[in-house]
From Swiss-Prot:
Entry superkingdom: Bacteria
Coarse class of the protein's main subcellular location: cytoplasm
Record's protein name: S-adenosylmethionine synthase
EC assignment: 2.5.1.6
Pathways involved: Amino-acid biosynthesis; S-adenosyl-L-methionine biosynthesis; S-adenosyl-L-methionine from L-methionine: step 1/1
Annotated gene: metK
GO biological process terms held by the UniProt record: one-carbon metabolic process; S-adenosylmethionine biosynthetic process
Note accompanying the cofactor annotation: Binds 2 divalent ions per subunit.
Region (Flexible loop): 100-110
Role, per record: Catalyzes the formation of S-adenosylmethionine (AdoMet) from methionine and ATP. The overall synthetic reaction is composed of two sequential steps, AdoMet formation and the subsequent tripolyphosphate hydrolysis which occurs prior to release of AdoMet from the enzyme.
Length: 413
């Protein structure tokens, strides 16, 4: 099927699930800042007036978890009576954290199939499969639907934080449908934005009038600014633009829906455009291959596309708990590569060290929170972990590796 419509969604930082992702990653940042060897598997739950912090943590760091949770909730925008029914100052914060099981840690601490230096003897923290993807649809080598959905969600939050549209509240979602012809994006079919807002806007209380005002304001302040640099632009004549289709969105955030860490894994990755291994990222330290190996798989896929060895590349990695080397490596370029799949796999094996400790070292995943003032992973917890031009993410910096692949691939051309 070469002609189709593909749709991806994103959510703002005030979405209940994203509140949880940010809290879990804020805990991870704080622990790694004080103790880079911390083992963290932190889960968060939010509901009306409640935040629960749970999971397993082994660390020398000492944190005021309740204070940290309230800080994150406040910075998102949930503070005071006007914040949409969830208040950082008054919500209950419960902490129920345990230590990591010794049965898990013994397999992670030293893998049994390597005899090299101890640094590279770290086994995978769990079994699992991870996918990485890249394509040439956007400058950041991401699929256009998720790229644009993230742009819209970030801009929606920006105009709220900067009081450009002071009636907006923290919860919100975006969705973008792109028309493809012969597998290439050609136009923006539909843009959907659902955003929480105050019940009264500039003295307007009529539901229909409120929705029309929000629609007009979002087109001017959100849609147009984030699409001005795109080759494919929306138009009021050809692009369907939907805003709050149910009519109003006053009750939102944790007051409207419960939230949980790890429930937006498609938003975090490729918007459904590529396969997903099922593992979430937030709240997990770098020994968890759900996170670190997914970053590495993206690094490999993006390097391949950046090197122009393929227009699209999907890389699957699999691991076994306590074993350092990947159990399997698979690459699929969907018929777009200039060399064979077997040759691409050989290039990957010869140019990328995909053992967990090597990935951690390559990207400096344990030390980045401390180097960056105590906040790194939390910034990835909203608006995607990949294709982030607003963040300096090591797995997105592929120029050097792509050049290596160009040189190494000459033997196969």
């Amino acid at each position: 099927m070469s002609d189709f419509i593909f749709t991806s969604e994103s959510v703002t930082e005030g979405h209940p699930d994203k509140i949880c992702d940010q809290i879990s990653d804020a805990v991870l940042d704080a622990l790694l800042k004080e103790d880079p060897e911390s083992r963290v598997a932190c889960e968060t739950v939010v509901n009306t007036g409640l935040c629960l912090l749970t999971g397993e943590i082994t660390s020398r760091a000492k944190l005021d978890y309740i204070k940290l949770v309230r800080k994150v909730i406040k910075e998102i925008g949930y503070e005071g009576a006007k914040a949409g029914g969830f208040d950082s100052n008054s919500c209950a914060v419960l902490v129920a954290l345990d230590e990591q099981s010794p049965d898990i840690s013994q397999g992670v601490n030293e893998a049994d199939d390597l005899n090299e230096d101890l640094e590279n003897n770290t086994g995978a923290g769990d079994q699992g499969i991870m996918f990485g993807y890249a394509c040439d649809e956007t400058p950041e080598l991401m699929p256009l639907p998720i790229s644009l959905a993230h742009r819209l969600a970030r801009q929606l939050a920006k105009v709220r934080h900067e009081n450009v549209l002071e009636y907006l509240l923290p919860d919100g979602k975006t969705q973008v449908s792109i028309d493809y012809k012969k597998g290439v994006p050609v136009s923006i079919n539909t843009i959907l934005i659902s955003t929480q807002h105050r019940a009264e806007i500039d003295g307007i209380i009529n539901e229909k009038e409120i929705r029309q005002k929000i629609t007009d304001d979002l087109w001017i302040n959100v849609v147009l600014p984030v699409t001005e640099d795109l080759e494919i632009k929306p138009s009021k004549e050809k692009t369907r633009f939907l805003v709050n289709p149910t009519g109003k969105f006053v009750v939102g955030g944790p007051q409207g829906d419960a939230g949980l860490t790890g429930r937006k894994i498609i938003v975090d990755t490729y918007g459904g455009y590529a396969r997903h291994g099922g593992g979430a990222f937030s709240g997990k330290d770098p020994t968890k291959v759900d996170r670190s190996a997914a970053y590495a798989a993206r690094y490999v896929a993006k390097s391949i596309v950046k090197a122009k060895l393929a227009k699209k590349a999907e890389v699957q990695l699999s691991y076994a708990i306590g074993v350092a080397k990947p159990i399997s490596i698979l690459v699929d370029t969907f018929g777009t590569s200039v060399i064979s799949q077997d040759n691409l796999k050989e290039l990957i094996e010869n140019n990328f060290d995909l053992r967990p400790a090597a990935i951690i070292k390559e990207f400096d995943l344990r030390n980045l929170p401390k180097k960056l003032g105590g906040e790194f992973y939390r910034k990835t917890a909203s608006y995607g972990h990949f294709g982030r031009n607003d963040l300096n993410l090591p797995w997105e910096s592929v120029e050097v590796k792509a050049a290596q692949l160009v040189e190494a691939s000459k033997d196969f051309l």
